[in-house]
C-alpha cells in the first residue's frame, strides 16, 4: 500500500459527504466536490478520512495515494485556502487588481488584462506584488503560471514575473 495513501486525513473542522462516487468537502471558505476513483475506498471515521485501495493492483495502490493527496488539498483549501505570491522585477512593470481582472504593464506596447476564473482572487499589496488566492490548489497554481507566462524571468537581467520564492540563476554576459 502507498505510504501517502496509508496516512489518515484530519478534517480540521470541514464537513465531508460521500455520495455516489464523489466526495463533497465543505468548510468556512467554500465547497469542493471531487470524483472518487472506483479503485479507491473512502471511509469516514470520527473526524478523519481513511483511504484504501480496492485490490492489491499497482494502479489501485498508486491511485489511493493520489486521491488522498487530492482530498487532503481540498480539506486544506476549504479551511485555510491557498495562495501564491508573484513579484514583478523590471523598470515600469506594474500590476493592478480590479475586481475579477488583473491589469499588467509588462513592457509591451499594450497592457495585458488577465481575467480571473471563478473561485480565484488576485490582490496587489504593492504595484510589483501579486497575491493569488483561492480554495482550489490546482486552479491557484494554474493562474499563477499563466500570469508568470506573460513575461517569465529572463536569464541575463532577471526581469519579468517570478514566483516570490523563485531563485533566478543569472547568466554571465558575453565577454570580448
UniProtKB/Swiss-Prot annotation:
Entries under PROSITE patterns matching the protein: RIBOSOMAL_L6_1
Entry keywords, A to Z: Ribonucleoprotein, Ribosomal protein, RNA-binding, rRNA-binding
GO cellular component entries: cytosolic large ribosomal subunit
GO molecular function terms noted in the UniProt entry: rRNA binding; structural constituent of ribosome
Gene Ontology biological-process entries: cytoplasmic translation
InterPro entries linked to this entry: Ribosomal_uL6-like, Ribosomal_uL6-like_a/b-dom_sf, Ribosomal_uL6_a/b-dom, Ribosomal_uL6_bac-type, Ribosomal_uL6_CS
Keyword Ribosomal protein recorded: yes
Pfam families, alphabetized: Ribosomal_L6
Subunit structure: Part of the 50S ribosomal subunit.
Cited function: This protein binds to the 23S rRNA, and is important in its secondary structure. It is located near the subunit interface in the base of the L7/L12 stalk, and near the tRNA binding site of the peptidyltransferase center.
The family this protein is said to belong to: Belongs to the universal ribosomal protein uL6 family.
Annotated HAMAP family: Ribosomal_uL6_B
Name under which the protein is recorded: Large ribosomal subunit protein uL6
Organism expressing this protein natively: Burkholderia cenocepacia (strain HI2424)
Amino acid at each position: 500500500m502507498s505510504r501517502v495513501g496509508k496516512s489518515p486525513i484530519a478534517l480540521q473542522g470541514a464537513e465531508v459527504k460521500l455520495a455516489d462516487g464523489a466526495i463533497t468537502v465543505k468548510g468556512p471558505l467554500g465547497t469542493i466536490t471531487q470524483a472518487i476513483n472506483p479503485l479507491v475506498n473512502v471511509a469516514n471515521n470520527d473526524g478523519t478520512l481513511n483511504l484504501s485501495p480496492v485490490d492489491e493492483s499497482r494502479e489501485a495502490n498508486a491511485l489511493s495515494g493520489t486521491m488522498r493527496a487530492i482530498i487532503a488539498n481540498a480539506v486544506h483549501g476549504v479551511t485555510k485556502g491557498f495562495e501564491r505570491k508573484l513579484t514583478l522585477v523590471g523598470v515600469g512593470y506594474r500590476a493592478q487588481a480590479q475586481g475579477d481582472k488583473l491589469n499588467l504593464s509588462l513592457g509591451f506596447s499594450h497592457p495585458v488584462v488577465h481575467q480571473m476564473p471563478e473561485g480565484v482572487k488576485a490582490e496587489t499589496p504593492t504595484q510589483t506584488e501579486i497575491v493569488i488566492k483561492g480554495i482550489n490548489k490546482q486552479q491557484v497554481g494554474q493562474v499563477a503560471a499563466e500570469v508568470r507566462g506573460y513575461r517569465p524571468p529572463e536569464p541575463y537581467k532577471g526581469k519579468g514575473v517570478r514566483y516570490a520564492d523563485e531563485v533566478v540563476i543569472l547568466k554571465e554576459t558575453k565577454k570580448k
